[in-house]
A protein has these predicted regions:
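PLP-dependent amino-acid enzyme catalytic core
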Residues: 1-292
């Protein structure tokens, strides 16, 4: 499906990926991985169980796809992620695995590896979607998300220059979208958003409130040579941006989406790059979160 490109004030455009099934941009990668793996025979409906470590959005995307094709989903969800998202994942059919192991200090990846090693004992036939190493995620955003933005932007704005503001967990959506815009003839100024205190390139991470971003590993699919600038955003800044966006549109953004909007607002307030449209992504809705 094609999601909206919402035009806001000051030539800021927001790709409303929260309109996807599953409620986020992660549906794109999940759909591409599952459908491609069914075609290749790596996933057999009614037999295979998907296993993945995810903080919520990719899991919801997997459920949105797998529920239609008869594939079960087992997820290792870090204990720091939204309790509400975990509740939703369970209610829509996911099995949340390894909670006791996580409480004992295992990482979600270690939980996945442990369950894969024990799959025969538990009568499982696992397929690990492995979003941090699966290039089908990047492909989904290059073919779909970025190409949609390019077509929609041409309908709303003349010129070939565009600022793209985004966050990175795996880096799949950032890299895929930027490269798609370049494929369509745009001169892209990519700006990466990080939480205050984080520097993913140099593997510096601190505790923060932007789930799914700067997650403790260098984003594997982020093409660093693409990035023109990195901006950091504080919790107070993204919360103010979320309130401002809600006042203007009536729409409630999730934390990473609000952080991207905070950067867009800051660029406009600084009166730089004024003649160039800004595109950012509403990755998911603020309704998923309970940390206001």
């Amino acid at each position: 499906m094609t999601t909206r490109l919402l035009q806001c004030r000051d030539d800021i455009f927001v790709k409303m990926e929260l309109d996807n099934p599953g409620g986020s941009h992660k549906y794109r990668a999940a759909k591409n991985i599952i459908e491609s793996s069914i075609i290749s025979g790596k996933i057999i409906p009614q037999k295979t169980t998907i296993i993945e470590k995810t903080g919520g959005n990719f899991g919801l995307g997997l459920l949105a796809v797998c529920s239609r094709v008869g594939v079960d989903v087992d997820l290792a969800v870090g204990l720091s992620f939204s309790k509400y998202k975990r509740k939703i994942l369970r209610s829509f059919g996911a099995q949340l695995i390894g909670i006791d192991l996580l409480q004992q200090g295992m990482t979600p990846r270690e939980v996945v590896e442990y369950h894969i090693s024990k799959q025969e004992v538990h009568g499982k036939h696992y397929f690990y979607t492995d979003q941090f190493n699966n290039k089908l995620g990047v492909e989904a955003h290059r073919i779909q998300t970025g190409s949609e933005i390019a077509r929609q932007l041409k309908e709303n704005h003349s010129g070939n220059d565009v600022i793209f503001i985004g966050c990175a967990g795996t880096g799949a959506s950032f890299t895929g979208t930027c490269n798609a815009l370049k494929d369509h003839g745009y001169n892209v100024i990519p700006i990466l958003i990080e939480p205050d205190g984080c520097d993913s390139k140099n593997e510096i991470f601190v505790d923060h409130r932007i789930e799914g971003v700067s997650v403790g590993v260098r984003p594997p699919f982020l093409e660093w040579n693409l990035i023109s600038e990195t901006m950091t955003v504080s919790s107070s800044e993204f919360m103010k941006a979320r309130q401002k966006f809600f006042s203007e549109t009536g729409l409630l953004l999730g934390n990473s989406s609000a952080a991207s909007m905070a950067a867009a607002y800051r660029i406009r307030e600084e009166k730089r790059l004024q003649s160039i449209p800004i595109v950012t992504i509403a990755y998911d809705s603020g309704l998923w979160y309970d940390d206001y």
